[in-house]
Design a protein with these regions (language model features):
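Sec/Tat signal peptide C-region and signal peptidase I cleavage site
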Residues: 16-20
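Start-of-domain marker
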Residues: 21-87, 98-100
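Sec-exported extracytoplasmic/periplasmic mature domains
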Residues: 50-58, 149-152, 265, 269
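Acidic/His-rich structured neighborhood in mature extracellular/periplasmic domains
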Residues: 84-193
Length: 298
């Protein structure tokens, strides 16, 4: 009887959908500026960060293995004090598969220039959903959730909104620590608070709707209906030009310039000249400093 129960349990588990973690994350730690000492400790830190990002279940969504988000975190550390305080920067890049192709579209390429944290060998980096106790855990948690929200936005209209409460609580908790840098909306550059604003403000919802159309109605149809897909992409750029006139400070514009400007240029290289010229004009209005890159569309 016990054997029968075991067999039934195995069969039941086999029928359940496997749930994978959301992120397929890689972590690189660049410490050249800190000298050659302590490399063993840095490798330990890298492994801890990889485990934190790649093994934590960030949401209650059911991801299959093939649906995991490809993302890389590159930490470049510039300074270290004797007390174990580090200063540096973080570059994050994420990609999304395009339906019916082997192409991976960039969905995020951002640089956070002001990361600071204190870390000593052996310090635990344990995820806490509401009130992270370590600035490095708070930093990684925020960007992990932000990457997932951006990915969800690309698959369903405003799909990332479900993570707004989590992100808001995390930012509020981090801002309660005066010595944790990079969280205040008054700091220069694209602080984490400003990125949160992008996901929570009604003013940015139209940008996020464009993000959805660009991916689901544009890129995901390129393999089956390339002409219709390019038409959608041109419609989206027209909408973005109008949005820029009324919402020019949105973080969406900097993210679009980093990820979608090069992509659009490449996608339209072999399009009819009329489409290339129209796209070039709209991208020039969106990104006034991109004139040299746009020469490829002439």
């Amino acid at each position: 009887m016990r054997l029968l129960h075991l067999v039934l349990l195995v069969l039941t588990l086999g029928l359940l959908p496997l749930r994978a973690q959301e992120l397929r994350a890689t972590v690189e730690l660049r410490t050249e500026a800190l000298g050659s000492e302590g490399q063993i400790h840095y490798e330990g830190l890298r492994r801890q960060l990889t485990d934190l990002l790649g093994r934590t279940r960030w949401t209650d969504l059911a991801y299959k293995e093939g649906e995991r988000i490809n993302v890389s975190f590159i930490f470049t550390l510039h300074e270290r004090s004797e007390a174990g305080e580090y200063k540096g920067e973080l570059v994050i890049s994420a990609r999304r598969p395009i339906y019916g192709t082997d192409y991976m579209s960039p969905t995020l390429l951002l640089r956070d220039p002001s990361i600071t944290f204190t870390y000593l060998p052996g310090d635990p980096l344990t995820y806490q959903e509401t009130e992270p106790e370590h600035p490095l855990v708070a930093l990684c948690s925020f960007y992990a959730l932000y990457v997932i929200a951006s990915d969800l936005d690309s698959f369903s209209p405003l799909g990332g909104s479900r993570l707004q409460p989590r992100l808001s609580a995390l930012v509020a908790s981090a801002m309660s620590h005066p010595d944790w840098k990079g969280w205040s909306s008054t700091e220069r550059g694209l602080s984490r608070a400003r990125r949160l604003e992008y996901l929570t403000s009604q003013e940015d919802e139209r940008y996020r709707q464009c993000w959805y159309r660009y991916h689901r109605e544009g890129l995901d149809r390129l393999s089956s209906s390339p002409e219709e897909a390019r038409e959608v992409l041109l419609e989206v750029t027209k909408e973005l030009v109008e949005l820029r006139k009324i919402r020019s400070r949105s973080v969406a514009l900097s993210d679009l310039e980093q990820t979608k400007l090069p992509e659009l240029i490449q996608l339209f290289r072999s399009a009819p000249q009329s489409e290339r010229l129209l796209l070039s004009e709209r991208l020039r209005q969106l990104f006034p400093t991109a004139g040299e890159q746009l020469q490829a569309l002439r």
